[in-house]
Amino acid sequence: MRIIFYLTLLLFIFNKVKSDNCTIGGLTATSCNETSQQYYFTQDKFTSEDIIQIPFGAKLYFSGDVVFNYPVNFNCQPSLKKELSRFVYEIDCLQVFSNGTITYNAEEIYCSVDFSTVFDIDTMVDKPVDMVESWSRFMKPTKGFGETKVYEPVVYSRIKAQAGYKCDFNPGFRTSRRVPDKYALHSKCAWAKALFPAGDFNIRITPCNLQNNSESVRKLEEIGFDKNFYMEKLDFTPTDGLFYNGNRESIYIRYYPNFEKKFDLSSIQDIFDSYLYIINYCEDNPNKFEISFGMQSDLWDHRAFNLTDFQLVKNVNGTFEGSATRNQISIMVLILSVLLVLIL
């Protein structure tokens, strides 16, 4: 009995010491149980000050309101669930709980999904498999986002597939067929099939004052790019894949990895052609405009988005042609100067 008592005491002391260091994803909790990965925050209002990385299996409990001003990275894994006579995979990335409201003001939310344990590689599946129709409650808390000006944030996907498989990611705030009041992340995985890469476009239109031109905004909405391939960024009002930001007079388009449509400069020519009638509809000097766009090929690392060195301008016959920007010219001048110095 004495031995059991001392063992219990040692376990209590050990757990107490562990709980004194309640740091999770860059946050320090008021208390925690590290064994069960449960972390408790007792503030009346919690506001994030940096990017938060929530490890797989961890749960964060907040007593009051929560405001995420910086990106949050959730980590989750599919689990089998029996539905009627069949089994389906389901992902529930619920890792943040609050007695108050949860508001996402962050530019992005990330969702890391581990699919590596899902497939039986011996089956050699030769067609896309509808692997996950998940409902992810972090995307829209029960009590809403709090502020009406806060739009639903983008979810980046970091998909880890089993060897030989590749998975696409069709994001969106589409209602789950199985759980109508929840939103779904849809993904398909295929064996030995080409997966086209992802990319970003930040299209700036000048001199159109779209913010004060309701007709132009309506024209933008009529384009309706395929929402399976395009997604909004925070502060962009969603339509069917095309998103308008009145403050910056720009359009942001995100192209996710997919099995069906290759992402390259030529594939978006039709997109720019579609803007012709929109731009010409603008009241401010409709015959003079230019479109510049930025491109980022890797969405899986958190990097600042920068406008790149490619610019499109309208020429006399109404088509688009590429032209180097001042940055390109400056770099070329610098290189030539260095070469001349070396030669002389």
UniProtKB/Swiss-Prot annotation:
The lineage of its organism: Eukaryota, Amoebozoa, Evosea, Eumycetozoa, Dictyostelia. It is a lipid-anchor; GPI-anchor. Keywords: Cell membrane, Glycoprotein, GPI-anchor, Lipoprotein, Membrane, Signal. It is found in: Cell membrane. GO terms for cellular component: plasma membrane; side of membrane. The keyword Glycoprotein applies. This is putative uncharacterized GPI-anchored protein DDB_G0275411. Transmembrane segments: none annotated. Residues 1-19 form the signal peptide. Its main location: membrane. It comes from Dictyostelium discoideum (Social amoeba). The keyword Lipoprotein applies. Residues 323-344 form a propeptide. It comes from the Eukaryota.
